[in-house]
Amino acid sequence: MLQIKNLYAYYGKIEALSGVTCHVRTGEIVTLIGANGAGKTTLLNSLCGLVRSRGNISFDGASIMHLAPEAVVACGISQAPEGRQIFAPLTVEENLELGAYLRFRQRQQQEIAVDLKKIYDLFPRLWERRLQAAGALSGGEQQMLAIGRALMAKPRLLLLDEPSLGLAPLMVDIIMDTVVRLRREGVTILMVEQNARTALGIADRGYVLETGRIILSGPAADLLNDRQVTRAYLGKDYREFTEGR
């Protein structure tokens, strides 16, 4: 589905990604893990046309390099960004409708109404708060809203940037259960997560990004048991803890 080959990305003269090559197959959950500043968000933003880059990015066999962000969305890719970036003064429902802005232009109002109901079925709390200002939501509710807004574009590939950031453990479980459910319903997912243990626990495969380069990749279960990953991202006692259970 998604092929990234020899990708470089820049902020001014600063090189943020250095020859990244990776892929996502249809129906997978793939996670990118790494420390702050490793380039994870830059990679997602490069896919969305938000960062100057060179190399090759193809989606379903067609190049999406240098497409405008709205054209990337039209191809079937949408993102729930880091920090959620909701429109705080607007209502929950208005935020969700903004996720379907391209479809409004195509006069798909009836389909949009159906999909809005699906989002409320996925996140009942959003239905309860639909007429309230989005800025009044809790952190977990705002994350639900960010994911719901991205889904309103009807993506085939959903990009999630730090979906567990700042959330209580119970809410993290709810969000990750939702990610698994979305995959079952046919949405392919590429997820950036600093919480490596949580991300690898639900992913099929993973990539470890360090200072703009992929340094390790493989099945999620293998990465969970890799000594380098264990010490750098899971804590030095994680292996002993799991082996002692």
PLM features: what roles do these ranges have?
Residues 1-245:
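Glycine-rich phosphate-binding loops of nucleotide-dependent enzymes
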